[in-house]
Amino acid sequence: MAKKFNYKLPSMVALTLFGTAFTAHQANAAEQPQNQSNHKNVLDDQTALKQAEKAKSEVTQSTTNVSGTQTYQDPTQVQPKQDTQSTTYDASLDEMSTYNEISSNQKQQSLSTDDANQNQTNSVTKNQQEETNDLTQEDKTSTDTNQLQETQSVAKENEKDLGANANNEQQDKKMTASQPSENQAIETQTASNDNESQQKSQQVTSEQNETATPKVSNTNASGYNFDYDDEDDDSSTDHLEPISLNNVNATSKQTTSYKYKEPAQRVTTNTVKKETASNQATIDTKQFTPFSATAQPRTVYSVSSQKTSSLPKYTPKVNSSINNYIRKKNMKAPRIEEDYTSYFPKYGYRNGVGRPEGIVVHDTANDNSTIDGEIAFMKRNYTNAFVHAFVDGNRIIETAPTDYLSWGAGPYGNQRFINVEIVHTHDYDSFARSMNNYADYAATQLQYYNLKPDSAENDGRGTVWTHAAISNFLGGTDHADPHQYLRSHNYSYAELYDLIYEKYLIKTKQVAPWGTTSTKPSQPSKPSGGTNNKLTVSANRGVAQIKPTNNGLYTTVYDSKGHKTDQVQKTLSVTKTATLGNNKFYLVEDYNSGKKYGWVKQGDVVYNTAKAPVKVNQTYNVKAGSTLYTVPWGTPKQVASKVSGTGNQTFKATKQQQIDKATYLYGTVNGKSGWISKYYLTTASKPSNPTKPSTNNQLTVTNNSGVAQINAKNSGLYTTVYDTKGKTTNQIQRTLSVTKAATLGDKKFYLVGDYNTGTNYGWVKQDEVIYNTAKSPVKINQTYNVKPGVKLHTVPWGTYNQVAGTVSGKGDQTFKATKQQQIDKATYLYGTVNGKSGWISKYYLTAPSKVQALSTQSTPAPKQVKPSTQTVNQIAQVKANNSGIRASVYDKTAKSGTKYANRTFLINKQRTQGNNTYVLLQDGTSNTPLGWVNINDVTTQNIGKQTQSIGKYSVKPTNNGLYSIAWGTKNQQLLAPNTLANQAFNASKAVYVGKDLYLYGTVNNRTGWIAAKDLIQNSTDAQSTPYNYTFVINNSKSYFYMDPTKANRYSLKPYYEQTFTVIKQKNINGVKWYYGQLLDGKYVWIKSTDLVKEKIKYAYTGMTLNNAINIQSRLKYKPQVQNEPLKWSNANYSQIKNAMDTKRLANDSSLKYQFLRLDQPQYLSAQALNKLLKGKGVLENQGAAFSQAARKYGLNEIYLISHALVETGNGTSQLAKGGDVSKGKFTTKTGHKYHNVFGIGAFDNNALVDGIKYAKNAGWTSVSKAIIGGAKFIGNSYVKAGQNTLYKMRWNPANPGTHQYATDINWANVNAQVLKQFYDKIGEVGKYFEIPIYK
């Protein structure tokens, strides 16, 4: 629909993770009913970047128009204005240059679109122009003539190929508009001196001095340029040499004559975006409608209706009473309102910016929301999904520019189509109006983008899609809207498509508008063409320089006067061309940033065509003193630097772009980067007797396929590995793809880019990232179960900055996986759950084919204050004699409860109101709340959590029957007992009601619940299967067994909260058993319900989160945040809250590791620990020592290892490698070595000597002794001091503001992620957590 550390705990690596977003987003409805009140735009709960904060403020602050102040309008939108009087030509240009323009209009086609509410129409003209301009200058002393051949494109509607760009090279971001193929046009430019003076309309010839020869480029076809270079170019034919504008010389008068060439226009049918066309026939009057100060809809022309039309009437293809109602009412579509959000991402479609391939019909799936509520919800959750527009019965609101893709239809639909949501309406007329509005908007988009209506519903091909069709034919989503919503109004997609098709034919003047009488029922006539006010807008890919004398920049091409610009004599990108009557314009923007400046008249610029930049890897020589520019064909105002040194210097080129006939290259020389003309470069010649290059500058580049996360402390991204200084990056704390590795001397780099889009960000030093190997993703088709609350990420191994969504619902949810990738030793799967798509670690998934997955939460958070409404987990049978059922506990009287009597229902809420306690009944099949009954009217039991239990059974001859709900009554019996005797029963899930177990499955082709005591398990189903996992024993009152089928049992109390290593599993009568090893070495059987994957404890702080934040905010040394590398600032209230909110942190799979208990060993094997220590100097293969130290002194093994790695520089420090102290000096020449792996006693003023002294006094004569002995100090000094988690160390919730280990608000977050990565590397997870709870 979206961030850092001088301080560190001595035991942690202060690293920061990072990554990018994947557009596998789905459009979802607001979760709660919405009203029409204002909503603020809210960013995700994350550390907001400065730019995001600025964007938020722009959106959340209301804008009002002050009298006398013009509202800003997007320069890319061509807006009509009332005053269409053209400005006069600047006479000063007559004295500077001559422009001859010869143009012929070859084809014109008018398309009219009408605004249905305002009865307004805009005309659209398709122009095709071919212009040839000659500039001639005859030199009496030279006979050289240079000719240029230039290509300009002429696009025809029927030649459009939507797939043309499928295999194109990746284009530079700055070139956002796409061009079709070009036809060659020849231009000849010669230089001449002429003393004749001529003046015609748009043609002026200035006087020239025959004795002075002006400087003219050999290759410049534009006929106008600025003089930026002092060097002469007498031999090159591929450099655009600027031309002098100075007509006055100290010794002689010099005047240059020019004929300006305007490029041929692409012929397109792009209209003035996006007036919703009306159904009127012809334009009668035109008036400018000012922008609204509130809704700010687009400006449209008003038109008068016509009673008759020469066009034929449309014949509907389907019968539709609602469409007939719309036609009869002659419904008009409202204006399109724009409600854009600046922080929404902008990515081009797969064919480029402004190249959608169709439109998708969605509905919001929320009967209680409003259009404003939906938009507000979307803006708060845009990182999950956002769409282009919403429509209801009264309004059309465009929320994102349709030139760029949105996230509403899954990864494959997003890159192709415009996404539009239909907001639910509830009466006949409103629904009809919403269908009319959607059809009108859809037809407008199709017309604007030169697309023809073509339904994709049945064959997966076309321009009009439903979300269901996306799911069926493209995939990446499983939504089926809008069919169910349309059916609820006795309407169908076929009817809606017929209405869209009719609207399109009306807009393109192929059939008669509604409300007119057709006088010619024959085939539609061709649109008539106007002359003076036709507008044509086409995409362009060029560059331009605004002349010193100009008419300024125009916000829209309808403006009568331009505003002054500071972009004169700078090379700008041209992205669009517009022709309005006799006026022609270019839309110009910053070449590098893409910032749009506005429209400029073609006569006010020097224009050149430009091909898309391409990547190169070449080396050239360049002379010292040459100029590097920030853009190709740069001017003196765009100088990047000068080439330093003497003689030839080495220029490493990485990018190349052709401007007209000249070639420019981007690269680096002596640590400075920029663009330079190829004219100034020479190919580096190879020496005849090459010598071995110095190891300091030898470059080796290899392919790579890993992933990386940039550390918080980094030197930035490098454009090339030769750069001496990196650029600041905002890609920290995100997972990026690594495509290449480079070694330059003793420096090593990775080339990192966006995981999903493949966009390269630059080179980063290898020691500034956390790197993991990655295998190629593979396609799969598997189904898993996943718990609610688990995070979906946009990339595998994603960070909290790359969350795609959170699994919703209650109980196990179905996750459909379509892709799998292995990152180091961990496996990640991509799939969809409850309409949300993203990556999940396989650790959080369980296969349905296997028996129940255990709960990850063992100890529920205790309730400090008993709420008036409690959440319970019970099942109840309603008594025959009851006092009735209430819709609300506040109802004074109840309705009859007869139909609920003697039936079983679920209970999930309980509330005490006055002297009565009520429970909320819920249907066990549909989970629908039914109403409140008095607790005295029901018989209740506790009900456990439903778990998977796959098994095959036979029903005993004596049984109680099959029921629709566990513990059901006779009124809920599905099959009688006598029909089930000795029948096969296939179980799929199980649940405990009180102490009785019930199984859910199929028997006699019926599915329902049956008591486990009525079943006999097949002998083949009770066989053990291998299963490897380490659980935590969570029930001190239960037992373990040597044989689960025997009665002998032994108490689990001595093993409470210890780990239990499982090696196999068995399902016995619906109960899951695990067989494994206790810590004392015994091999036993334990029921799955007595085990948990992780042990979570909750500790109440006694204060509110807001109180804790206020204390932190008032500290003398304020909490710090690093929005940019190496730049610290005071964190604001929301940033501190985001970092301290334990509820948010606990739900993040990585950040929750700041609650990992560091004072609790996890009893990991030495073999597992050695995986982390491989290649770590003297610490390698010391896993046994770390394991012994952790057990002996009660410390987490991973924490202990991370501490040692930091202090020893990954086991390579001299302090760790050992030595001795003799006569106050460090030495390695004595017979004894002493080691210190935790930096204990190593004070900064003489760290090595002091550290070795401490080790010598402690007797640490080996690395293992240093590990075990040092662990005691670490435990007593840090962990055992009471702050036994990273969160406690940073925020000290027991006494906020005191004894805190860092000021960086993200210190705990970063170190938590480091712990999580270490666990991932050995294929384990943390087992013991303690989470503070605020009031």
From Swiss-Prot:
Domain GW residue range list: 533-610, 612-686, 700-774, 776-850, 868-943, 945-1020, 1023-1096
Location of the region described as Endo-beta-N-acetylglucosaminidase in the Swiss-Prot/TrEMBL record: 864-1335
GO cellular component: extracellular region
Region Disordered: start-end pairs: 51-88, 100-262, 514-535
Cystine crosslinks: none
Region annotated N-acetylmuramoyl-L-alanine amidase, chain positions: 303-863
Subcellular location as annotated: Secreted
Annotated transmembrane regions: none
Polar residues biased stretches: 58-88, 100-127, 143-155, 176-223, 244-258
Xref: Pfam families: Amidase_2, Glucosaminidase, GW
Chemical reaction(s) catalysed: Hydrolyzes the link between N-acetylmuramoyl residues and L-amino acid residues in certain cell-wall glycopeptides; an N(4)-(oligosaccharide-(1->3)-[oligosaccharide-(1->6)]-beta-D-Man-(1->4)-beta-D-GlcNAc-(1->4)-alpha-D-GlcNAc)-L-asparaginyl-[protein] + H2O = an oligosaccharide-(1->3)-[oligosaccharide-(1->6)]-beta-D-Man-(1->4)-D-GlcNAc + N(4)-(N-acetyl-beta-D-glucosaminyl)-L-asparaginyl-[protein]
InterPro entries to which the protein is assigned, alphabetical: Amidase/PGRP_sf, Amidase_domain, GW_dom, GW_dom_sf, MGlyc_endo_b_GlcNAc-like_dom
Predominant place of localization: secreted
Family listed: In the N-terminal section; belongs to the N-acetylmuramoyl-L-alanine amidase 2 family. In the C-terminal section; belongs to the glycosyl hydrolase 73 family.
Entry text on domains: The GW domains are responsible for directing the proteins to the septal region.
Function: Endohydrolysis of the di-N-acetylchitobiosyl unit in high-mannose glycopeptides and glycoproteins containing the -[(Man)5(GlcNAc)2]-Asn structure. One N-acetyl-D-glucosamine residue remains attached to the protein; the rest of the oligosaccharide is released intact. Cleaves the peptidoglycan connecting the daughter cells at the end of the cell division cycle, resulting in the separation of the two newly divided cells. Acts as an autolysin in penicillin-induced lysis.
Protein name per the record: Bifunctional autolysin
Source organism per UniProt: Staphylococcus epidermidis (strain ATCC 12228 / FDA PCI 1200)
